[in-house]
Amino acid sequence: MGEEAPEEYELGGGEDERVMEWETGLPGADELTPLSQPLVPAGLAAAFRIPPEPGRTLLDVHRASAATVSRLRRASSSSSSSFPAFASKGAGTGADEAESGGGADGGNGNTNNSSSKRARLVWTPQLHKRFVEVVAHLGMKNAVPKTIMQLMNVEGLTRENVASHLQKYRLYVKRMQGLSNEGPSPSDHIFASTPVPHASLHDQVPSPYHPHPHHHSYNNAAYAATVSSYHHYHHANH
C-alpha cells in the first residue's frame, strides 16, 4: 500500500482551506503513530480474535480530513446565518434598542434560535407614529403593552419593547401637560415627530365635574317648590 497521496490531490484547495486555530495543541507529524503500525499488536489481536484493520494511506487520511473540514465549515456557516436581521411591516424599524428581544430578525433564517437571542429595536418616527395612533385608539388609561403590540402588528416587536416605550410616552405626555419634568424632552426627535393627540392629553388628566345647566335649574325649581309647599301647609293649619 502506498504511503503518499498523488501530487495532484489537494485537501479542499490546499493551504487556503487550513484553519490554523483548529490545529493548536495537536501533535506534530513526527509524534503520530505511523499508518503502517497497527494499533493492536498482532498477538493481542489473535488472542481476542480481533480482525486486522485494513491498511490506510495518506490519501485516505486526506479524504477523511477534507470531509471533516467540509462538515465543520457547513455547521459554522449555518449557525452564523441562523439569526436573521429584523424587518418591520410597513413601519420602518431600525436595527437595535435596549430590550430586545427578538428583535432584529429578518426573513429567511432559522426561527428556532430567535428566542435565545434578542436583538434590539430602534424606535423610528414611523414606528412611533403607529404607536401613538394605537394608544389614541385605545385611550391612554386603557392602553396596555400586550394590546398595543397586537394592534401595531409589527414583526419583531416584543411586549418588552412596547412596555418600555409606553412608560416613556406617559412621562412625555405628563411633561407636555406641565405635570412633570421627567421623561423625554419636548425636543426629542422621536417623541416630537408625532404630536400628542388631544384625546390623549384630555384622557391623562380627568376633567373636573361640571353639572349640566338644565340639571342645575331643575334642582333649584324642585327646592323652591318644596319650600312653597311647606309654607302653604304651615299657614293652613294655624
Curated annotation (Swiss-Prot):
Entry keywords, A to Z: Biological rhythms, DNA-binding, Nucleus, Transcription, Transcription regulation
Pfam family membership, one: Myb_DNA-binding
One Gene Ontology cellular component: nucleus
A molecular-function term among this protein's GO annotations: DNA binding
Main localization of the protein described in the UniProt heading: nucleus
This protein's record includes keyword Transcription regulation: yes
Gene3D superfamilies in UniProt: Homeodomain-like
DNA-binding region: 115-174
UniProt record, GO biological process: rhythmic process
Biased composition (Gly residues): 100-109
Biased composition range(s): Low complexity: 71-90
Intracellular or extracellular location(s): Nucleus
Coiled-coil region(s): none
Chain residue ranges for the region called Disordered: 71-119
Keyword Ion transport found: no
Reported induction: Circadian oscillation with peaks at subjective dusk.
Function noted in UniProt: Transcription factor that is essential for the generation of the circadian clock oscillation. Binds to specific sites on CCA1 promoter leading to CCA1 activation.
Stated name of the protein: Transcription factor PCL1
Source species: Oryza sativa subsp. japonica
Highest classification ranks of the organism: Eukaryota, Viridiplantae, Streptophyta, Embryophyta, Tracheophyta
